[in-house]
Amino acid sequence: MDTPSDPGPGPERPGEPVELVHDLHDGPDLPAAVAASRRAADAARRVVAGLTAPGADAATLTEVAAALERLADVLEPHRRGSRWPAPRPATRTDATPDPAVWESHPLLGPSHPLAPPIRIERHGDRAVGTVTFGHTYEGPPGAVHGGIVAAMFDIILISAASIAEVAGLTGTLTVRYRAATPLFREIRYEAQIDEVRARTALVSGRSTADGVLLAEAEGIFVRVPRA
């Protein structure tokens, strides 16, 4: 597999304002429940990482299983039916949902133990995300599973659509893999709007590592009228 150099735009222009695309902030004013949720998710990620590259013996794994079963029993009474604060149709989406929705998002939420640790920023009219993948996301030896690569494109492309306030449900997502996405190296995702139509937005993006093009993607997002 070849590894062509990235021909696309480089880092953001000097002086260009940068802000988070989604309402996910850190700091001393973070609500106590959110801080505790993130701490619990971080601990859960460590457990998942240990289980996806196991080196422990049966006795240790039995002890871990018993501890996790006890913790699951503690959390069980507090489960909700959905991560959304209020029920809504499956086809309903908002460009700027409640921050709690982003907090528990399966692809970027810091309180979701399976979400890759991606940080998505607004750089002008582009969405730029950086993420380092660990063993939890390994597919081929030393590389990220292609399904995870595609999932990250889904969230970075719709983040670009959010900047232009044309976010919607994913209609199509096409990914072209140019090189393996390595583990334990910073991966940069970029996306921008190419065209906006009556009810759809066409968005494209790329991922790179140290200037090497890893994959490219195009997506069509369908805007759904708010109820």
Language model features: what each stretch is:
Residues 9, 122-126, 144-167:
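Active-site helix/loop of acyl-thioester processing domains in fatty-acid/polyketide metabolism
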Residues 21-28, 156-188:
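Hydrophobic beta-strand-centered segment that forms part of the acyl-chain substrate-binding groove
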Residues 32-47, 107-143:
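Catalytic strand-loop segment that frames the active site of acyl-thioester-processing enzymes
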